[in-house]
């Protein structure tokens, strides 16, 4: 069943540590990224970091008297920027999984 597999050189502890390091690096890299979305021709702008925490919000003064429009633009903008962050997380996870083939290689 395990013919051809060299179990003498297989060190699962090292592989796990390597994977954990790769995952931590990816997590730190993602957290430092900033994603920005604009709606209403730039009247609303939201920026979030890779942890999906809002780091900046800009609203044009002209929207402050139009609650319905402001709500629509905020929802649209927020959904878009969250989607950007989620797509980035998926891409980073796929890249991390692609790196599994390099386990145990020095």
Curated annotation (Swiss-Prot):
Keyword Metal-binding among UniProt keywords: no
Subcellular location: Cytoplasm, Nucleoid
Record keyword Cytoplasm present: yes
Similarity field: Belongs to the YbaB/EbfC family.
NCBIfam families: DNA_YbaB_EbfC
HAMAP family reported in the protein's UniProt record: DNA_YbaB_EbfC (MF_00274)
Functional description taken from the UniProt entry: Binds to DNA and alters its conformation. May be involved in regulation of gene expression, nucleoid organization and DNA protection.
Protein name as catalogued: Nucleoid-associated protein Abu_0429
